[in-house]
């Protein structure tokens, strides 16, 4: 099964015909959404329960994990330990997990998260924390894809039942992360299409959020990506 979804549910006026859409309205058009609300702060359990109730049974969420979990937030300001942080996050997400509307928790690491023994050990901690829950890992440092590491990295992802996110993003000379279609978890595959706007990807001004993924794929690019999606769909359940 192939599910198509967008990032956030409220900002797609061309989809719903409204400037600000509700999750209920979005869910009448697409069967999946990626949400990053929890990345900026763990939401109340009641709020997550409201999201779950707003969508039909066959709807699924890709939920980006709290920034502290992906080594990008100052979790020490709010939690006494990593275990307390994880407990708070999983408690918040309980309605999503129990409803079986979770497609995957997305752990999106930054470009500084390189292929080191320490970071491999941290990935093992993530699997331990989340037990058998579906986890999609996005690696934004090209050291993981170097010829002397990539085979071991893919095997590690398989052994830990991680779904390595297949990413299409701008190829920055200093840190080119390749489009690498490969199934590491036959239960689910997650593609993310960030566009190919190199200048926007590197923007660091006040408008960087609007520029980062500002890109219009042409017909041939869409055809090429669609072919990859179809091929991977034959190797995974979803």
Residue ranges and their predicted role:
Residues 1-238:
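Residues lining hydrophobic/aromatic ligand-binding pockets adjacent to catalytic sites
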